[in-house]
Amino acid sequence: MTELFIDGAWVDGAGPVFASRNPGTNERVWEGASASADDVERAVASARRAFAAWSALDLDARCTIVKRFAALLVERKEALATMIGRETGKPLWEARTEVASMAAKVDISITAYHERTGEKRAPMADGVAVLRHRPHGVVAVFGPYNFPGHLPNGHIVPALIAGNTVVFKPSELAPGVARATVEIWRDAGLPAGVLNLVQGEKDTGVALANHRQIDGLFFTGSSDTGTLLHKQFGGRPEIVLALEMGGNNPLVVAEVEDIDAAVHHAIQSAFLSAGQRCTCARRILVPRGAFGDRFVARLADVASKITASVFDADPQPFMGAVISARAASRLVAAQARLVGLGASPIIEMKQRDPALGFVNAAILDVTNVRELPDEEHFGPLAQIVRYTDLDDAIARANDTAFGLSAGLLADDEQAWHTFRRAIRAGIVNWNRPTNGASSAAPFGGAGRSGNHRPSAYYAADYCAYPMASVESAQLQMPASLSPGLHF
């Protein structure tokens, strides 16, 4: 039950016991006691004590530890990928990709620190202007369940490089992945107190977010939770709040020559990771007319052949289970609400077993729904919207408070230029899936999708603050005095 990591040691939690389960088998994967408010207090105090020495450590020394962490990720790739698969249900092929991305993020983050922050000098009269960057102090990192290794890593790695200390609160649905990741950090030689792990559910998260001794909070998760955090920190400008949230993402399909290529990219956009990527396409906009009819028919044909299976099945499936049986039942309920509003099922979603997270890829035509809810349904539930022309498609695509990702599948380059100029989103792709993002590019969106860009270069920006100095090695009188001064 020693599942918390505080001040360099594994310790027991004093809060309620909870467990995680494999959503594809209902097998118990992890069990432990959650962190109480007192446990959170000890974790924050530990991080505060460790901050002075860690931030004073030479940057190269900090980077050496972070690089060792990356090397250990490569060595333990299979073990960590297996834990990710067991706890989240995602297929092993995808879990392995997640671990590889975690390791690759280290070099990207080190480069980002030097290029976007770091130290810069410029000569000036009687001295030099110096721009340095300083860490904030103790930061809380809240991680999601869909990428329980990679996404928290996108906050933790740049935070540590910059000299911050961290209290990490993972999703209660993926505590085993968090423990395995923190063990790798420990074995990489991270000093005691620099990274602390507090496991738990809502009460643990509230205790950490409310703690008056944190200097920043970095969050990846749902827009509803992120919005609550934003309200909570209203009137506290001293807190650095970085939010990366979800989206109601549109994929616009134009009339193209290669219809199977378009269907493939639509399948990837909507159903990769069982639809549990924040960049997945929730709305697929298809032209009215014969081409659109053929596209929808082909999309339904291919999607109907996708069979979800357990994470370690051989051969590997395209889709695993969604994160829990509860999440699966919520998706089926969301489908029922949309049908009640006038949506027409093309492929109806069904939950295979009420105790498991298996659902099939589903497609609804929502064109005739007059007041379509602006919601993110986090799973393989795609909505078809028919449009008349590109202007109509762009207007419908932008009809959302979110703005994370968007995509256009089109042979016409001019259509792409029109689309990219008019669309409102942080990730905008042409002839690529909406969930295709470069690890070396900013990741995030506009509107209710967030306020910062984690996981790549821009993460360095919110992990440190700029300190501007004008400096002269010699104290001396200026060559000329200001008017009215007499010496």
UniProtKB/Swiss-Prot annotation:
NAD(+) binds at G221, S222, S223, D224, T225, G226. Disulfide bonds: none annotated. Its EC number is 1.2.1.71. The active site is at E244, C278. Keywords: Arginine metabolism, NAD, Oxidoreductase. Belongs to the aldehyde dehydrogenase family. AstD subfamily. Catalyzes the NAD-dependent reduction of succinylglutamate semialdehyde into succinylglutamate. This is N-succinylglutamate 5-semialdehyde dehydrogenase. The lineage of its organism: Bacteria, Pseudomonadati, Pseudomonadota, Betaproteobacteria, Burkholderiales.
